[in-house]
A protein has these predicted regions:
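Glycine-rich phosphate/pyrophosphate-binding beta-alpha loops
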Residues: 39-46
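Conserved hydrophobic/aromatic beta-strand scaffold that supports enzyme active sites
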Residues: 10, 113-115, 179-181
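C-terminal helix-cap and adjacent tail motif
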Residues: 3, 17, 175-212
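Short loop-to-beta-strand entry elements in the cores of soluble alpha/beta enzymes
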Residues: 46-55, 146
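Short, electropositive alpha-helical surface patch
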Residues: 165-177
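Glycine/small-residue-rich phosphate/adenosyl-binding loop
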Residues: 53-131
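Small-aliphatic-rich amphipathic alpha-helix that forms the alpha element of a beta-alpha
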Residues: 33-38, 112-114, 119-166
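Generic N-terminal amphipathic, Lys/Arg-enriched alpha-helix
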Residues: 6-23
Length: 212
């Protein structure tokens, strides 16, 4: 029988791991992560998700150029102006910012990327499109954590969507929704930093405290 306590423990300790060793990751582990992704719910079970596994350094370097540009022009300045989110101290937030900067400079060095995509044909992405791909992304993040691998969900490349999707070689009608850099973590796994439920959960009416 499955140990559900282990599942909840993994959820509580699957934080973004942005500092990754460049050492190769066995294909067997990547396959397990992909299987976990393909077990996720999706709209109408249409399974329009597509997963592009990137190991080619030249492709990663081509994307990293735009990834860094997005940091320099948008993400970096936003961090400098932002206060720490709920459940996170200033010291923790500064460490997070440093890790984001590290990933910016070393994004292409992660041994494996999984690019989560949807095959959408001529239809434009809609507000609900993500419902058919982001559950798979979360499954893959949890699977990576269970296997002792570090990963993070990043969508920053979408600030230069056309340029990065061209570098990735995506065909017309296929859109990327996230990139998961995966590798063995340099640091230790630990609990996620989150605020209390009382600040984010309501009952029956917006603003009415949830008392359970």
């Amino acid at each position: 029988m499955a140990d559900y306590d282990d599942l909840f423990e993994i959820m509580k300790n699957t934080r973004a791991m942005r500092r990754l060793h460049p050492d190769p990751v066995p294909d067997e582990l990547i396959r397990k992560i992909l299987i976990a992704g393909a077990c996720a719910p999706n709209g109408g079970n249409t399974q329009r998700w597509r997963f592009l596994v990137i190991k080619d350094t030249k492709i990663k370097q081509a994307v990293q150029v735009w990834y860094k540009k997005a940091f320099d022009e948008v993400v970096g300045p936003r961090y400098l102006k932002s206060a720490p989110p709920p459940g996170v101290t200033r010291e923790q937030y500064d460490r997070q910012h440093a890790a984001v900067e590290y990933l910016t400079d070393h994004f292409h060095e992660a041994p494996v990327w999984i690019v989560a995509c949807l095959e959408e044909g001529t239809a434009s992405p809609t507000r609900w499109s993500g419902a058919s791909i982001y559950p798979a992304v979360q499954n893959m993040l949890l699977a990576a954590r269970a296997l002792g691998l570090g990963a993070t969900l990043t969508t920053r490349h979408l600030l230069f969507e056309k340029e990065t999707e061209a570098a990735l070689g995506l065909p017309p009608g296929v859109h990327s929704y996230a990139i998961l850099p995966i590798g063995y973590p340099m640091g230790k796994f630990g609990p996620v930093g989150r605020g209390p439920l009382g600040e984010i959960v309501y009952e029956d009416r917006w603003g009415n405290p949830y008392r359970a």
